[in-house]
Every structure is written in C-alpha cells, then in structure tokens.
C-alpha cells in the first residue's frame, strides 16, 4: 500500500452511496430535473400488503396517543417514524428500487413490534445489549430513533450505531453526516440504519447518523435537525457532551466543515472528507457553472462559506480527508489556503490526509490513520477551556466560542473578529476586536481563578505586542457563585462596562436569534398564517396563493416536514408567543398583517409598496421580509416567503444557501421560476437596529 501523504486538519470517511450532482447538465435553470426523482411502481399486491400493515400500525399508534403514560409520550416518536416513512412512500411514490417494497415491509414490521412493545411497557430498542435466540448477551448495534422536531412538530429519524461497552459512562460519540442521496428519503434512510453499520465507529464509540432533513448538506433545517438529533441522543445514551466529534464524507463532508466552523466549542474534533467548503469556487470547479450572483447573494454566501470562518478552527482539532484524484479535494485545499493565509501570528497548517491515487471514496488505510488520530485527540482532551480564543463570524446567528460571546456587531455580513487571551499567570483577559460593538467574557467557577479584569483594544493583524493591557481595563469581582464575567459595550470609540443590574433593553436591535435573513425564521419553531379573504389586487392574490402552496409543498418535499397552518381567526396567544409567524397575503387579506402593518419599516398601502423614498405599484409588486414581530419582539414575523432557495438550487448542495436578504420587493409581472419568486425589483438587509438602509 503506498504511503499516505499528510497535509493539515482532520476529517473522514465512508463511501457515499450516490452522491453528487450531475455537473454542467444541472446548470440549466429552464430545465430542472425533479428532486426527489420519480419513483418506480411496486406491484398491486405489495401495495395492498403495505397498506394493510400500515393500517394496523396506525391503529396501535392512535391508541398510544391517547395514553397518559409519560413513557408512552416520550417514546412514541420511536414508533411514529416507521409509520410516517411508509405512509409518505405510499402517498408520494417514494419507492426507487424494487427492493424498496421489502424494505417498507421490514420497516412496518419493526414499527408494529415497537408499538406493541411500547403498549406493554417493553421498550426493548432502548437496550444497548439484548439476548439473542440462544440466550446469549449481544450488542444491540443498529438502532433507529425518533424525536419530535421543534421546527414543525413532525417526527424525524436518526440512526445510532452503538459500540459502547456494557454499563459504560461518559462515552465518546461521533456525528456522521451522510453523503448526497436524492433517493434517500425516510424509508430508505430508516431501512439502511436498521442494519447498516458503515461507517463502523471505533470500539467504545457511539455513532449518530442524522437524517438531516433529507438532502441539504445539514444546512438550515438540516442543521437544526443535526443538533436536535444530538440533543436527543445525549438524553438517551451515556454520551459525554464534551466528547463529541463532527464528521462526514461528500455532502456530509460539507456539513462537517460548516458545523465545525460555526460551532467550534461543541466538538472535541472535526473530520470533514471531500464535499465542499464554500459556494462560488466549488460551483466553478465541480459544476463548471458561470456564476452571476447579485450583490446580496454574495453577501449571503458568507453564512456557509467556511474559509471566512477558518480562524475558528484554531480551537478545534481538525483532520481533513481527500482522495488524491477526487475533484472534491478542492474543499480541503481551499480551507488549507484559508488557514495558512491568516495573519502570520494566527496562521496554522490544516491537517489534510490525502489517499494516493484515490477518487471519491475513503481509503481503508486512511481510515485507520484517521481513527488513530481521533483516539489520540480524545485521549488528550481536557475539560479545561482554551486560554486563547480566535473567533470570526459574519452573523450573530453564530456568536460564541467557549468563553467569548458576541452580542452586537457594527455591521452584519462583514467579518467580526475577537482575539482574546486569558493567561492563567495574569489577572486580565486581553481582547482585540474588529466589527464588534458588544461582547461578554464568562468563566465557570473552576476556570482561570486568577482572572479579575478585561482589557479591550482594536484588532490589528500581526500585532507585535497584542497582550498589552495598558488601556481600557475593566475590573470585575467573582460573582457569588465564584463564576467570573464581564460584558463590554462600545459607545463610539469608547468601551464601557455594562452593569449586571442594567434593565434589559426593549430596543429593537439585531441580536442572536433575531438577526435575519428571511430563512432564519425557518430555523426555529414557525407557523404559517394563511389569508382569510381576498386582498386588494387580484394579481397579488394569485401570486400569494401560488407561493403559499409552493412553500407548503417544498417544505414537505425538501425539508421532509409538515407546516403548521392557521388562519388569523384560529391564531391563539400561545401561537404568537411560541412561533415565528409567516404571514401570507396583504393587509386586507390577512388580519394579523393588518394589525402590524404600520409598525413595519416597509409600508404596504392600496396604491404602493413604500421603501423609504422609493415606491412600487401595489398592483404589480409584493414585499417579502423578515422583522421582529411587533406582537412579540422575541419572535420573527415574515411576509410571503418560505425558505428562499428554489428548484434550481436543489440540484447541487453548494447552491442551497439563502438567496434573499432581510427584505425584497418582488415584481409580479415576471412569473416565478426555478430561481426566483418573480423579478427582484429591490432588496437589501436592514441595519443593526432593524432600520432601512439608504438606497444603494
């Protein structure tokens, strides 16, 4: 076997079953193939048998739903996932292989078995070790679990491959993000996870396989699904949250890259393999696509373009993997460049394991080496926080790394950076910032007990003596529970310490969880509020109806969920309290929109849509926007939009990023197509106080 070459950051692994898009053939926006693809016919006999078994399963589920037993309520999703998978396959022709009929039968039989077990109080699938037919104890390796998603209330599956020891505690877990599989819907995913242990985790390790809401590289709703699956697994298995690695290959490699840079303090290691790490270069290299993005699309690329965030890997051990002749080696090459092209005193080499003469697969020898290195990283891992933090973000959506949290930026979609040093021999944290206007530092009671102050200065690349703390020094005593923290806010050019007893501000500002863009509303619990009557203009009504139905349909097809839908008359106070509201219609057709219309920065009258000093005819234009809900400023309100990427973007995961900023005016005289909801007459981001910016 030829000797492996090593470049620099860690990632890994498994064969991706179908995986990537079709290249230049998928660059024609006017001729877009469907995703998921059309299914194949199963026989009438197979369908009849599946429908009979599904009916039986649903009857037991209906009885279980009426139970007041807390265990039944908690573990019912472990049963419902089997019913939903086959129900969707039957209703939507989600069979792509003649063997899928048998897979559906197996899935239903397991669902029926679990339903009866839950009914009798025997949740056998929870046991890590079971008795086989001979009465011997054997490991229950492959288990499919389910949880109810906060996004839309649907049950979502994930797989567990469990190689932990009997009665083990504080177990290491690896999240494995899967490769692209346009035919990998719920049925196929569950059937595979019931029996397939590839990639096999290392001995003693639990591997978590998120469904990821289908085929989106674990972005947007898929990102939330991954974190929800992890949260559920930690509750159900003896996993140490500080011993979790993020991994994947192909599309899953892309997922691992962005989850690594966005959440650098969640993992003890990252192991991305192949895939992509940004949008524009990958689409040029892999897709041969001639990109002509709008200025706001380029801004929004920064949400998932990982090279901008490369600095964050300084605190996260990373092992990248590629085959030498795999075109997707480009992903790690780009990240290696980004890591090395940081300022001289911050740059580092990315560890990149390259398998010689290997295409799009994981070389067995490389896999062994990766596992060895991950085991070492796990072994030397400590619960101590890093003394040095280097953190960059472009949005308050991702605003923390370990003991540093950014609360406000000068401007979104420009890199905001914090470089902080907490020398245990010193009494002060030294902080340098760029494009940051408010931040906090927090240590637990057992972390760096000598720290008493924070010094903050502007960030300068290659600063010679960046530890200097001669000015802007802020002191704080340990809190009564011996934790330590300080919150600092910049007022003009002057930093000031925020009093811990300062009343919470009610000002409408961009903050973590309320920073946009439009797509962010669908990364939290949301509800559609449909029109109650006709609106002011027939053409607008027609467009609203079309886009509403499309948004409901595509959430189901692409994000594998079911939208909560109510009319304004059905809306309850708890809905306003708990959900981001996606309002459809205009102020005449939607009473909820009518209540808040005059409180939005964009006005919508019978004659015009008014954006500052710009006016657009209300007969032929409609606004889409996101804004803190005037009825509950802790939640969003969105007008007339679901997630903003469309059918053309389904064909390559690198395209699946937000397409519209905080607001846009849609010219309805141009019909919607596979890329846009109509012609975008104007669009922009709101400012940091959710105000309109001057026209460009």
What is the meaning of each model-derived region?
Residues 179-192, 265-311, 315-316, 330:
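Mobile cap/lid helix-loop segments that gate and shape the active-site cleft of serine hydrolases
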Residues 168-237, 527:
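Active-site machinery of serine-nucleophile hydrolases
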Residues 23-79:
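Amphipathic, heptad-repeat alpha-helical segments
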Residues 164-169, 218-251, 261-267, 312:
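Gly/Ser-rich "nucleophile elbow"/oxyanion-hole loop immediately N-terminal to the catalytic nucleophile
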Residues 321, 325-329, 333-429, 434-436:
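C-terminal catalytic histidine-bearing segment of alpha/beta-hydrolase fold enzymes
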Residues 23-40, 92-93, 100-171:
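A domain-start/cap signature at the N-terminus of enzymes
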Residues 430, 442-696:
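Solvent-exposed alpha-helical segments and adjacent loops
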Residues 246-248, 271-273, 321:
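Short beta-strand immediately N-terminal to the catalytic nucleophile in serine-hydrolase-like folds
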């Amino acid at each position: 076997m030829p000797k492996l070459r090593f470049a620099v950051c860690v990632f890994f692994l498994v064969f991706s079953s179908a995986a990537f898009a079709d290249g230049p053939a998928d660059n024609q926006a006017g001729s877009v193939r469907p995703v998921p693809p059309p299914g194949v016919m199963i026989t009438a006999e197979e369908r009849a048998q599946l429908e009979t078994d599904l009916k039986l399963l649903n009857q037991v589920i209906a009885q279980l739903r009426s139970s007041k037993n807390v265990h039944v309520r908690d573990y019912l999703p472990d049963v419902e996932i089997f019913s939903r998978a086959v129900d969707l396959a039957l209703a939507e022709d989600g069979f792509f292989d003649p063997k899928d009929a048998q897979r559906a039968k197996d899935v239903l039989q397991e669902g029926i078995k679990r339903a009866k077990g839950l009914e009798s109080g025997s949740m056998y699938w929870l046991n890590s070790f079971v008795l086989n037919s001979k009465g011997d104890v054997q490991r229950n390796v492959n288990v499919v679990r389910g949880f109810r998603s906060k996004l839309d209330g649907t049950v979502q599956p994930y797989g567990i491959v469990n190689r932990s020891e009997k009665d083990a505690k504080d177990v290491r877990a690896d999240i494995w993000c899967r490769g692209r599989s346009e035919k990998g819907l719920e049925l196929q995913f569950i059937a595979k996870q019931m029996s397939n242990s590839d990639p096999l985790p290392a001995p003693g390790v639990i591997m978590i396989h998120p469904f990821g809401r289908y085929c989106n590289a674990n972005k947007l709703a898929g990102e939330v699904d991954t974190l929800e699956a992890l949260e559920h697994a930690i509750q159900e298995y003896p996993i140490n949250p500080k011993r979790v690695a993020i991994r994947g290959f192909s599309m899953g490699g892309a997922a691992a890259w962005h989850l690594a840079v966005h959440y650098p303090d969640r993992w003890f290691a990252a192991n991305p393999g192949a895939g992509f790490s940004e949008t524009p270069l990958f689409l040029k290299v892999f897709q041969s696509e001639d990109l002509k993005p709008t200025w706001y699309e380029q801004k929004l690329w920064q949400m998932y373009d990982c090279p901008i965030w490369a600095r964050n890997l300084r605190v996260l051990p990373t092992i990248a993997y590629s085959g030498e002749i795999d075109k997707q080696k480009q992903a790690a090459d780009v990240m290696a460049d980004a890591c090395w092209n940081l300022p001289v005193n911050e740059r580092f080499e990315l560890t990149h394991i390259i398998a010689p003469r290997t295409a799009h697969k994981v070389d067995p020898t490389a896999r062994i080496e990766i596992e060895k290195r991950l085991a070492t990283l796990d072994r030397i891992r400590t619960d101590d926080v890093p003394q040095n933090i280097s953190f960059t973000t472009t949005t308050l959506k991702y605003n923390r790394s370990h003991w540093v949290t950014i609360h406000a930026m000068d401007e979104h979609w420009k890199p905001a950076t914090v470089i902080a040093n907490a020398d245990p021999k010193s009494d002060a944290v030294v902080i340098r910032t760029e494009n940051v206007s408010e931040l906090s530092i927090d240590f637990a009671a057992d972390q760096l007990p000598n720290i008493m102050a924070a010094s903050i200065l502007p960030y300068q690349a290659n600063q010679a003596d960046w530890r200097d703390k001669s000015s802007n020094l802020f002191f704080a005593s340990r809190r009564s529970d011996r934790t330590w923290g300080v919150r600092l806010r910049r007022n003009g050019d002057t930093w000031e310490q925020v009093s811990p007893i300062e009343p919470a501000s009610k000002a409408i500002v961009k903050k973590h969880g309320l920073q946009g863009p439009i797509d962010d509303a669908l990364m939290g619990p949301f509800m559609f509020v449909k029109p109650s009557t006709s609106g002011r203009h027939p053409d607008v009504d027609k467009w609203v109806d079309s886009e509403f139905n499309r948004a409901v349909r595509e959430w189901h097809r692409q994000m594998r969920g079911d939208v909560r839908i109510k009319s304004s008359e059905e809306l309850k106070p708890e809905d306003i309290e708990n959900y981001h509201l996606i309002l459809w219609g205009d102020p005449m057709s939607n009473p909820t929109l009518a209540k808040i219309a005059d409180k939005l920065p964009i006005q919508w009258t019978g004659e015009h849509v008014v954006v500052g000093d710009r006016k657009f005819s209300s007969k032929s234009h409609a606004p889409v926007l996101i804004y803190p809900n005037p009825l509950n400023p802790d939640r969003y309100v969105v007008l007339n939009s679901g997630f903003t990427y469309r059918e053309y973007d389904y064909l390559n995961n690198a395209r699946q990023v937000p397409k519209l900023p905080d607001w846009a005016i849609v010219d309805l005289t141009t019909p919607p197509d596979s890329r846009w909801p109509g012609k975008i007459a104007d669009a922009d981001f709101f400012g940091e106080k959710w105000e309109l910016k001057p026209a460009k």
